[in-house]
Amino acid sequence: MGAPTAKRQTQATEPTTDAPVAIPQTEGAEEDEVMISMDGPREDIAVLQEKDDDAEMTLDQDGKPRFASAVNAGEGVKPGRMKVPIPPHRMAPLKNEWMKIYPPLVEQLKLQVRMNPRKKQLELRTCSNTVDNSALQKGTDFVRAFTLGFDVDDAMAIIRLDELYVETFEIKDVKTLQGDHLGRAIGRIAGKDGKTKFAIENASRTRVVLADSKIHILGGFTNIKIAREAIVSLILGSPPGKVYGNLRIVASRMKERF
């Protein structure tokens, strides 16, 4: 009887492999398991994703996404500098009209302006407040238009409208004239008291400047073409009455179109 009893005691005292074994864990180990565990729901990640979605996209009343304006997105305005030479005969008008010239450059285009009397040039450059990449080019075109002889109010249209530019050509590009013949051609373009020039400007919706043998036209592409054709006809010798008639026809067509 002693042997079976001893055998049973040894079987009862032997530990079974199926029972769970308690393994001591330190506080650092528990923290590591929490940080790397991916089994449970990650509420913190979901909250961050919701915040990012709300910041990037909003919905309107119809449920359509509304994104932020992309005007200032991407790269900023590149630094640039332009120098516009001022002719000697335009220095006095520039000084007289200075209070009208610099406000659109500084307030609207956000440029920095400096007048260099020694070199007789106007310097423009971008700064941290400049928001438009085309501001420097617009400011340069505005100052150049004034130096060519246009009024400040007419040249300021270049800043407001994008499709305006200045075209320049000489009378000798149309027909070789010298001496009195050249003077008569200029007089035919201007007309008595400037009536012919004003008629061309009103019919074509442009501005024309007669600077000796050079002619500067400010306006849109189509409008400049109409004014140029009328001026070329006068240079070639067409009667002013015929040119007026053609301008009336063109003006009526433009009114019907617009």
UniProtKB/Swiss-Prot annotation:
Disulphide bridges: none
A single GO cellular-component term on record: nucleolus
Pfam families in the cross-refs: KH_KRR1_1st (PF17903), KH_PNO1_2nd (PF22891)
Organism: Yarrowia lipolytica (strain CLIB 122 / E 150) (Yeast)
Gene name tied to this protein: PNO1
Protein name: Pre-rRNA-processing protein PNO1
Molecular functions per Gene Ontology: RNA binding
Keyword RNA-binding belongs to the record: yes
Single Gene Ontology BP annotation: ribosome biogenesis
Domain (KH): residue spans on this chain: 179-231
Domain of life: Eukaryota
Record keywords: Cytoplasm, Nucleus, Ribosome biogenesis, RNA-binding
Polar residues biased stretches: 7-16
Classification via SMART domains: KH
Keyword ATP-binding: no
Family to which the UniProt record says this protein belongs: Belongs to the PNO1 family.
Localization of this protein: Cytoplasm; Nucleus, Nucleolus
Subunit structure: Component of the small ribosomal subunit, ribosomal RNA processing complex (SSU RRP complex).
Main localization category: cytoplasm
Residue ranges, annotated region (Disordered): 1-31
Purpose of the protein: Required for small ribosomal subunit (SSU) synthesis. Has a role in the processing of early nucleolar and late cytoplasmic pre-RNA species.
InterPro entries in the record: KH-I_PNO1_first, KH_dom, KH_dom_type_1_sf, KH_PNO1_2nd, KRR1-like_KH1
